[in-house]
Amino acid sequence: MINCGVQEPNIVNIAAGLASQGKRVIVYGVAGFVLYKAYEQIKLNIKGWAEHSGSVIFVNAGANGCYNALGRGHLLDDDALLMKALDIPLYDPIDRSTFVRYVKEGLQQTGVRYIRLGWDNEVWRKKE
């Protein structure tokens, strides 16, 4: 586990380097920070060459608008379009078990995937 704090472009570059060596990487972020701040790194370093060797799973919380009250920077309103533009499959799990399944599947495959999460409802709080 590597925590780069609010250095989204750097964590994507680290993920690209690890994936290029065959590693399986999960990049977690809140709202649109990873996608918006590091889009060029995702485009060039993940899609450009790292996806062919390893696995990168982007997990992004806040898809249901639970962070919107924190301001424009926390809005996640066009993430699906950004991922589609890069031909990155989008997964939108409805509960914890579906999320776990998507992550396990992603770790077994080479390539990139994007999982968007919402946290502020009873389905996500319920432990299975």
State where each predicted segment sits.
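Short pre-catalytic strand/loop immediately N-terminal to key active-site residues, enriched for Gly-Thr
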Residues: 1-3
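Glycine-rich oxoanion-binding loops at beta->alpha junctions
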Residues: 6-8, 12
